[in-house]
Amino acid sequence: MSVKDRILQWVRPEVQALSAYHVADASGLIKLDAMENPFDFPAALKAELGVDLRDAAINRYPDPDAGAIRTALRELYSLPASADMLFGNGSDEIIQILAMAVAGPGRTILSVEPSFVMYKMIATFIGAEYVGVPLNDDFQIDAQTTLDAIKRHQPALVFIAQPNNPTGNLFDDETLRQIVAASPGLVVIDEAYTAFTNADYMSWVSEYDNVVVMRTFSKVGLAGLRFGMLFGAQEWIEQLNKVRLPYNINCLTQNAVLTAIRHFPEFVKQTEALREQRSWLSAQLDGVAGVTVYPSEANFILVRVDLPAKSVFSEMKRRGVLIKLLDGGHPKLAGCLRLTVGSHEENEAMLKALSGALAAVRG
């Protein structure tokens, strides 16, 4: 039997039908496709980080509970006393932990669409059913349709990204409360972009018995560390910890995260600068003919172009700027591109590349 035949026989058909998550090559390009913080660590923080990493006991397994981080985060986020936390190797691992513990074959994971692609991908990985409820044309939640879907499918897990990725907007609180009240299982509020908005749902973990909140340090400047966080009632965290792999946060990441928390005001300054750049960039994009700009509460801006989006994307790449092509990913994203908010210099270069690309495609 050939390798191909064995794969056809033994790899689950739904996995064979998938494509591996693609990360574009950004070599030599201004990278504005992945919502990363463009600013480097301050020199003094880098020096301190170097010492902390040097002192890490890499010959030993790391603290399995990352206890020092737990203490630091409880103070940083003013976590309710009744709440606990769980850490993952990025938010992706936390989504996987949630799905493994709560969903599975014969159960349903529900989210709105378009939203973060990993909700659907991980549902497929674990053999759960996935239900995606389309957003309205303005990318707000269709409350009645969503509530009807919850009633019909009785999802074990509901994921809501707030602000939403890739659209960048916030959903209104009243609709979210209706979803929480109607959901029979666990509702996960994904606050990956919380640093760029005033919205905060941490109090909901004590207000509701079926809500957990997910956050990450990736968007504030620590994407390379892959550190995700989940906050919820102690009883939920106790169950979820049973499927978390031991020692999943390595000692270098633990030391680096502690260093970052000690200097968190520096990262707050950077996120404030990016929020200012977002406002400036949105205003500039509003003046570009043929471009529709959508409101954003994240560190990226969704735009729709009146030309073939793939051609505009390719022309921008040819001009040295890499953005995210969303056209083709979901019917409601036809003609759409996602632009990460970078430094002022990067944003100026992106605007220049966009103008040139539009002119080239328009002919």
UniProtKB/Swiss-Prot annotation:
Pathway stated in the Swiss-Prot or TrEMBL entry: Amino-acid biosynthesis; L-histidine biosynthesis; L-histidine from 5-phospho-alpha-D-ribose 1-diphosphate: step 7/9
Family matches, as SUPFAM superfamilies: PLP-dependent transferases
Keyword Transferase: yes
One GO BP: L-histidine biosynthetic process
Catalytic activity, EC: 2.6.1.9
Cofactor section: pyridoxal 5'-phosphate
UniProt keyword annotations, A-Z: Amino-acid biosynthesis, Aminotransferase, Histidine biosynthesis, Pyridoxal phosphate, Transferase
Name of the protein described by the UniProt record: Histidinol-phosphate aminotransferase
